[in-house]
C-alpha cells in the first residue's frame, strides 16, 4: 500500500541553446496566451538527487570541496576509463574512487557524455532536510518489501531485474542528470507534452478539466493533470503503479512546478 510522502526537489534546467542571460527579459506567451515553456531543456547538474550519507544534513559544499569537485571532474573527463553516469561523477570526484559502470564488458568513456554543471548543493532534494526520500509506511519500522534486485548480476529470471534494467521505465519525471537527461516540452491550448529522452517516454498532460482515472487503474507514470498558476505550470500526478519503484513515484500524488525564469532557464520543483 502506498503512503503519502512529501519531498521538495528544486533545480534549474537550461535550454539546449543557452546563451548569456538578457536582463530585460519578459515572460513569453504562446498564441493561446499561456506561458511559453516550449523547447528542449537539459538537466546536467552534477548534484545527486539524494544526499550522500557523508554529508548528513549539510546542504552545501564548502568552498574547498567545490574547488576539489571542479578539479576532479575535469581530470575524470580526461581519463581513459569507463564513463560515469548520473551521480557516479559526484561520488567519484569526492571520494577519489572511480568504479566502472559495467566492469564485465566495459563501456564508452567520459568524452562521449555531456559536460556537467557544478553547483554547491549536496542534493537536489531540499526537503526533508536529510536530502533523502522518506521511507514508505512500514519501512521505518524495519518492514522489508519484495523488490527486484538492483542491477543485472546473475538474475535467475527476468523477474529479478528492475524495470529500468528491462528498459520499461525510469520513472516520471526522470530526475537523474547528465545522461539522457533532456526534456522536450510542446504545448497546445488543451495539452502539454513532455518527452523524456530516457526511454523516449512522452507524458501527455491535459490542461482542461477532466477527472482522474479510477483509482483502481495504476500506470507506470501515473495519471497527470495540469493547469497554470500565473507564470507557473503545475502538474498533479496520481495513480502510480506499485511496480514503479522510483522514490519520487511512491507517493499518492506528485506535484511538479515549471516556471520559466529567463529565455534559457526554467525553475523546476517537485
Predicted regions mapped to residue ranges:
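Bacterial N-terminal signal peptides
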Residues: 6-15
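Sec/Tat signal peptide C-region and signal peptidase I cleavage site
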Residues: 16-20
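Positively charged n-region of N-terminal signal peptides that target proteins for export
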Residues: 1-4
